[in-house]
Curated annotation (Swiss-Prot):
GO terms of biological process kind: exocytosis; positive regulation of defecation; positive regulation of protein secretion; regulation of defecation; synaptic vesicle fusion to presynaptic active zone membrane; synaptic vesicle priming
GO molecular-function terms, A-Z: SNAP receptor activity; syntaxin binding
Protein name per Swiss-Prot or TrEMBL: t-SNARE protein aex-4
Tissue-by-tissue expression: Expressed in intestinal cells.
Source species taxonomy: Eukaryota, Metazoa, Ecdysozoa, Nematoda, Chromadorea
PANTHER family: SYNAPTOSOMAL ASSOCIATED PROTEIN, T-SNARE PROTEIN AEX-4
Species for this entry: Caenorhabditis elegans
Length: 234
């Protein structure tokens, strides 16, 4: 049986004194405070950048909403104008039908050029309305009115400490809290503007479908009138 000598027995581990333990705890607390302060500064910088980004989002959303509202008005005008054009073409078609009994009259040779001009002019009018009126929205006045939505958006959290739990209770945390409140209000404004844009798009979708149908009807009527004119001129 093996025997251990006294020399082979390890020395007992010396436990730190109470003073040493307190110093180590204090050192760790100091390091933790420094880490918290560092993270707070980083969070503050991030919140400032978020405010800038959300402000730009609001500006873009306001401009887009204003453009959609202006586009909605122009779509109404285009739809009304197309309906009037089709009504006028139907009248022309009816009159040509009534004149078919006078085939061979020189009057129809005079009619040919104005009718071609009328068809070309009608397409130009629609093209000008789409290109000019839709690309020049009245943004400034609508932007100013819509910006009030951003400044007066619902303040869901107004009391201190609702967004973050205070650790240092210093000026950095105060500013960070204010920034978070501003971010919350900005996001609320963006959400409201997004809803407005969605509503506008939903309202305009059936109008675009009706305009497409009116355009097809217009082409059909013009083709029919052209056929009648060709028969009369030959």
């Amino acid at each position: 049986m093996a025997r251990k000598t006294i020399d082979s027995i390890p020395e007992p581990i010396a436990l730190p004194t109470e003073e040493t333990v307190q110093k180590r705890i204090k050192l760790k607390m100091v390091d933790l405070d420094a880490e918290i302060a560092k993270l707070n500064v980083q969070s503050l910088d991030s919140s400032i950048q978020m405010i800038r980004d959300i402000d730009q989002m609001n500006v873009d959303a306001v401009q887009t909403t204003a453009a959609l509202e202006d586009q909605d008005e122009q779509l109404d005008k285009i739809e009304a104008n197309l309906s009037n054009v089709i009504d006028d073409l139907n009248v022309v078609s009816h009159n040509i039908t009534a004149m078919e009994h006078y085939c061979g009259c020189g009057f129809f040779r005079i009619l040919r050029a104005p009718f071609k001009y009328f068809r070309k002019r009608e397409r130009d009018i629609i093209k000008e309305e789409v290109l000019e009126k839709m690309t020049s929205p009245k943004l400034r006045r609508k932007e100013e009115s819509n910006m009030m939505m951003f400044t007066n958006s619902s303040k869901r959290r107004e009391s201190t400490g609702d967004f973050m739990k205070r650790l240092t209770c210093d000026a950095i945390e105060d500013e960070l809290e204010r920034n978070l409140m501003q971010i919350d209000q900005g996001l609320e404004s963006v959400k409201n503007l997004a809803v407005d844009m969605h509503v506008q798009l939903k309202l305009q979708e059936p109008k675009l479908n009706r305009i497409e149908e009116l355009t097809e009807t217009n082409d059909f009527v013009v083709e029919g009138v052209n056929d009648k004119v060709k028969k009369l001129l030959h």
